[in-house]
Amino acid sequence: MKIRKLLLSLGVFLMTPAFCHAENNDISNVINNDINFSTRQYSLMLQQIGREGKVRIPKTIDKLGRMVYIPIDDWCSGFFPGSLCYLYQLTNDKSWLLQSRRFTEALDSIQYLTWHHDVGFMIGSSYLNIYRLNPNKAYKKAIIQTAKSLCTRFRKKAGVIQSWNVDRGWQSKRGWTCPVIIDNMMNLELLFEATRLSGDSTYWKVAVSHANKTLENQFRKDGSCYHVVDYDPNNGAVLHRQTAQGYADNSAWARGQAWAVYGYTVCYRYTHDRKYLDQAVKTLNFVMQNPNLPNDLIPYWDFDAPNIPNEPRDASSAACIASALYEMNNYLPDNGYTSLADRIIRSLSSPEYRAPLGKNGCFLLM
């Protein structure tokens, strides 16, 4: 996730008005340096993967520094082709478009996947992005079919898209019936776009229903969100509020807060319903005003982790929030959101977080 989100932040920034002040010139230099670095780093990664032949999708590195490749049904499979697409958008170098198409088209069968909710990540990052820049009928069809597949997970009586199946794996051991995780907000853009492309309002209505139920049940009074809310699919009653990846059920998992800020910003983009933007702002304020947020604005992996300041940082969460901030500035231009996003990008661009050239598996962030 960290690859895609940094590039998204850079791309959103470069589409803002021309820089005219010294501070803006400074961040412009940072961004241009990051783009140059990203092209060199990803060129090295493609050499490692292979520019032709069998498609292998990178996800991370193991403890020995070796590349970890994933099957196409892994939830992260769309991030690498999406990153290649952003490099094409940022450089206008068609070699990146060709590679993005190659890795994107390897995910063709995912449009029919119905056993988990992450198709929004997988197809949204890949097909939806490349369709914006290189539209064709096959890509459009894949986007709409993926939305149709995702909607099979919509539990009408509860009004939500079920995130995980509970009949196997570790999810079957938690006592859940219809778990919904905050990550699911990142799937809704795909549904909104499917309605725009097809004219079928079904996808839009599912997205709005899910956003509303999540707004109603997933957030605390301070604006932070639970990771998992388990529903009774027969009547929509909330059965549990827990975590799967945070420190504790009542803690604030950093990436989950980022999903919420970004997800509700996107919902506002499509619907112009102010309650979505208000929730994005409320969760953002929780993050930015949290006493455990470091000065460089890169959060610890959980705001309530027990060993702060000796806890890992979450660069992916910071990059996701930076991307949301650049967009939120379009809607609330007097709130200083661009300056906050610039601070995050400067931090992520520093040696503390940006990988050395040719190191870290040729990923961008450490």
Predicted regions and their residues:
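Glycan-recognition and catalytic cores of secretory/periplasmic carbohydrate-active enzymes
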Residues: E23-M366
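Bacterial Sec-dependent N-terminal signal peptides
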Residues: M1-N29
